[in-house]
Structures are given as C-alpha cells and as structure tokens.
From Swiss-Prot:
This is Fructose-1,6-bisphosphatase class 1. InterPro entries: FBPase_C_dom, FBPase_class-1, FBPase_N, FBPtase, Fructose_bisphosphatase_AS. The keyword Magnesium applies. HAMAP family: FBPase_class1. Mg(2+) 2 binds at residues 113, 116, 280. Pfam families: FBPase, FBPase_C. PROSITE patterns: FBPASE. Homotetramer. GO terms for biological process: fructose 1,6-bisphosphate metabolic process; fructose 6-phosphate metabolic process; fructose metabolic process; gluconeogenesis; sucrose biosynthetic process. It is an enzyme of class 3 (hydrolase). CDD domains: FBPase. It comes from Methylacidiphilum infernorum (isolate V4). Its cofactor is Mg(2+).
Length: 356
C-alpha cells in the first residue's frame, strides 16, 4: 500500500496554493466529499436501511425512494455546518434551503441531486449524487430563488459521485476533470483518473429507444443513421446503451467516449425536456466541457441558458464533440427547412436487424 497517494484533500490543498480555489471552497468540497461517503454507506445497505423511512411525493411529482430522503438529509446536515454556504437547492426540496442564522453567512450556494438514478435502486444498479457550486450574493440582501437562477457558465465547481462496484468522485474546478476512487478500508478518496478527457469521436450512443415515436425528426435521423452502421451514411457500426442513470452514462463517456441523449420529445407536452437544468444538466455540462466534450439542447449550449425556475427541465445531448456538433447541425437543418420530415420509424414497419 502506498502512503504517498494524492488524496482529494491533498489535491484541494494544491489547488488552493495555485490560487484556483480559496480555502472556503476547498472546505465546501471536503464537506460534499464527506456527505458522499455517508450516502455511499447508506446505498450499500439497500433495504436494510430503507425500511425505516416514510416516503412521500416530491416536488417533481415523483414518489421518493427512502434513500432519496436519506441522501437529501445527509447533504443538508453535513453541508450546512461548514459555514461556507448561504443556501442550498435540491431535487427533493420545492424551495431553497436557507442556512440557519446560527451559522456564519458563507460565500457559496450549493445545488445538488442527492441520489440520481434512484429508480435503479430496486434492481441494484448504479446510482450517484450530482452537485454544482455558485457564488452567493455579497450584498447582504436576503437570499432568494433568483440568486440560484444563473447560467451554467457561472459555476465555480461541479462534480458527481458514482456509487458502483467502486465509489468514484468526479470533480471539476474549471481547470480540467479529475477522478478519485474511494479506498473503503481507510475511507479516503484517492486520485486515480487525473485529467480525464472525452474522445472527440465515438461509436457508442445512449438513448431510451422506447421513446422513438415521440422524438423530433433530427434525433430520429441521427439514430437511424447510426443503426445503419457501415452500410449507412456514417460508414461505421455503433453500439447503443441505456442505463437510465445519468451519472453512469456520463462516467462511461468520460472513460471511453460516447454520446448521451435525453432529447426533446412530445410524450408529455408539459415536459418537452426530462432532465433538470440546475442540478443535472448544468453540472454535467460543466464537467463534460472541461473534459473536451460538448453539451447542447440540439439548438443551443445548455451552459448559456438562463434558468427560469429551480426545477426547470430541459433536453440534453452531451458527450463526444463531433457527435454533438452533428446533432446540432441536424437540428439546424430541420429548423431551417433543409431537412424534410423524417419518416422512417425504427420499430414499426421494419426491423432494426434487417439490412436496408
């Protein structure tokens, strides 16, 4: 066992010395790290712990899993005590959580999804936590919802923790993306994946193909061309994936490239996008761009969008840059009338597995 590992704490100390972050931001990241360790322990217990919690319907209109509630409480209790925050926003809370007056008024705002992909818990698949850090107002005015409604370009830090066979903590401070693996024996995150980079091209994409009939023509065009493989216009074979866990999809893309799509569709006209802008799309977009990838709605960069509400949903296309750029071009072609209505359903009159 090496005693000279670069731990997350040492890494943050180095970033402080380089002037990348200040001591308060470093301390906040350490608090988030601690929260994620507790969540990892809770997730690993599964039904052993979740039987004890009463569940309700959250602000999204979704039934909370017991571990959703537990993870949210862990983040609240640990992060409010560090004196670095003014407030927090979570997927599991309708309105901002204002730090109680007994704590020092901090310089930062924390936005987080305490347990992304929690629908996978019942089948024991990968879940994770996502977080984003913004600068808090300095004027001394009371903290309000509007202070959280800022474009993703203003993020100071973002990351996610993957609770899989190993626990991974992925972090960007705006100067690249780095991955840390939890050594469970000693309870320390150690740098194992420095300077993670997303390959510009790929042969792999992830999308929920059961929604094909609701997709816009540019997305159907893209997927159809990928499925045609070597015999189609792309001239290469693709693999299709779908885990239903954004943290797992993005981690795979960071490791070996790829494309993740949860595009705009017509399945529910009140929700043209499915993923949440503030605590899913923005932090993941910051990470992906810092790793050399790209994120878009198909029509604009997600990181440039000014949020309208805390729980705003949005279409998301992210991953290898060349593929995102191609999808942007397909959307532009369609919007400008250069692409005719695409009428080649994947799952109706012909098989995916038959040569055209």
């Amino acid at each position: 066992m090496s005693y000279h590992r670069m731990t997350l704490s040492k890494f943050l100390l180095e970033q402080r010395k380089k002037g990348v972050i200040d001591p308060d931001l470093g301390s906040l990241i350490n608090d988030i790290e601690s929260a994620c360790k507790y969540v990892a322990a809770a997730v690993s217990k599964g039904k052993l712990i979740s039987q004890e919690v009463n569940v309700t319907i959250n602000v999204q209109g979704e039934e909370q899993k017991p571990l959703d509630v537990i993870a949210n409480e862990i983040f609240l209790k640990i992060c409010e005590q560090g004196d670095q925050l003014q407030g927090m926003v979570s997927e599991e809370m309708e309105s901002p959580y204002i730090i109680p007056p007994e704590h020092r008024r901090g310089k930062y705002l924390l936005i987080y999804d305490p347990l992304d992909g929690s629908s996978n818990l019942d089948v024991n698949l990968t879940v994770g936590s996502i977080f984003s850090v913004l600068k808090a107002p300095e004027s001394g005015e009371p903290l309000e919802e509007k202070h959280f409604l800022r474009p993703g370009r203003e993020q100071l830090a973002a990351g996610f923790t993957l609770y899989g066979p190993s626990v991974m903590f992925i972090l960007t401070l705006g100067n690249g993306v780095h991955g840390f693996t939890l050594d469970r024996e000693v309870g320390i995150f150690t740098l194992t994946h420095p300077d993670m980079r997303i390959t510009p091209s790929t042969k792999e994409f992830a999308i929920n193909a059961s929604n094909e009939r609701f997709w816009e023509p540019p997305v159907r065009r893209y997927v159809e061309e990928c499925i045609k493989g070597k015999t189609g216009p792309r001239g290469k074979d693709f693999n299709m994936r779908w885990i239903a866990s954004m943290v797992a999809e993005v981690y795979r893309i960071l490791i070996r490239g790829g494309l993740f799509m949860y595009p705009r569709d017509t399945k529910d006209l009140s929700k043209p996008g499915r993923l949440r802008l503030l605590y899913e799309a923005n932090p993941m977009g910051f990470i992906v761009e810092q790793a050399g990838g790209m994120i878009s709605t198909g029509r604009e960069s997600i990181l440039d969008i000014v949020p309208r509400s805390l729980h705003q949903r949005i279409a998301v296309i992210l991953g290898s840059k060349e593929e995102v750029e191609l999808l942007n071009r397909y959307h532009n072609d369609y919007d400008s009338g250069k692409q005719e209505e695409f009428e080649s359903p994947l799952f109706s009159t012909r098989s995916l597995f038959r040569n055209p």
